[in-house]
């Protein structure tokens, strides 16, 4: 239910698999039934879950609640690769000797790009504070297009 074929008017990407994580993220099922059900063999069964390599999560520090000083951690808790793909980075809050920031940090090489973090992110206007950029896509161009800026 998470993976769809790109529409025919999508240019080079027509009929290629894509994921709309905000609508339905990949759950990184241990047996990858999507790969087994794929009629063309376009989806391969990865050796391990983090090897799925669908993309990498990118955090917008300007809109992420944790970077604003609030304790959120929703993306961290939603991640099936918790403490591997997303970790919580503790650091002093700039200009504040009393409070700390508990900010999510994506470990690119361990992120499978499943999108559960994006699907569950409570920030939505204009876009989630964490989005999955598909493998091979330019992160800045992709997020600008998703946010309606390009």
Model-found features: residue ranges?
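Ferredoxin-type iron-sulfur electron-transfer modules in oxidoreductases and energy-metabolism complexes
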Residues: 9-15, 20, 48-54, 61, ...
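Generic detector of bulky aromatic hydrophobic side chains
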Residues: 16, 37, 55-56, 112
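Short Fe-S-cluster ligation motifs
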Residues: 22-36, 61-76, 100-123, 144-150
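Iron-sulfur cluster-binding cysteine motifs and their immediate structural context
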Residues: 1-11, 30-50, 73-93, 116-135
């Amino acid at each position: 239910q998470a993976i769809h074929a790109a529409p025919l008017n999508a240019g080079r990407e027509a009929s290629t698999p894509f994921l709309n994580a905000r609508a339905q993220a990949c759950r990184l099922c241990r047996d990858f039934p999507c790969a087994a059900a794929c009629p063309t063999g376009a989806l391969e069964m990865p050796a391990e879950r983090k090897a799925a390599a669908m993309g990498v999560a990118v955090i917008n520090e300007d809109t992420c609640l944790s970077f604003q000083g609030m304790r959120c951690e929703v993306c961290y808790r939603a991640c099936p690769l918790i403490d591997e793909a997303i970790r919580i980075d503790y650091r002093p809050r700039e200009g504040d000797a009393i409070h700390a920031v508990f900010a999510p940090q994506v470990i690119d090489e361990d992120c499978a790009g499943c999108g559960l973090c994006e699907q569950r992110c409570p920030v939505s206007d204009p876009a989630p504070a964490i989005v999955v950029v598909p493998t091979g896509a330019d992160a800045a161009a992709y997020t600008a297009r998703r946010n309606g800026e390009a």
